[in-house]
């Protein structure tokens, strides 16, 4: 078969995917794609695409992310794909394979109610299984990560996509090891980039907003308030270090998926406004 007919998704005689703006340079297309999908992903932070965490849900996410780049955004590929020597699902089996994987995910209640170690373990498994299907001609990793980022949020966790983007080579290596049956590298990365939602809220939201979202954070803020009050009684040069250490201890506890114990009466008294 002539090369120009081997892949209908690329411009004849090139490896550049056909795209809406008509870019013919691969590097420029990568930059354009990254910029456009980053903007579209930002829209999903406050307005996520709802769905049943199945293929239709994944297709809707892919369409949203890549709508400015490819005409076929959100559509199942019609050509075979492989990465290195590992083939992905053939087009004829993408629908059935995805139904089976979505059913497996639903049987586990979409990973709700798990502590962080177990959540990381099961997410690594399901991500790798979905990634092996690779339903789209391009953009599978980004769409699948957004898909599981929404699933994580639904289960009470946050997946920090920016940290994955900033270590793309490491992530790609871990994904390749996962396709070969070794999930340890991807579990190690997920353990670093996944945090309980309440821990993220404690770090970045105003206290009133954080408490509205997660009332169980009351003990964490009381602990911090007590530490700040106590710090007023120690030498100035030691205050910041003491408060930072307390905040780090609270953050570590929350990152483990646990709640801070309520401060003692004495500690709470120290934290009252003077």
Task: List each model region and its residues.
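FIC/Doc superfamily catalytic core
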Residues: 1-274
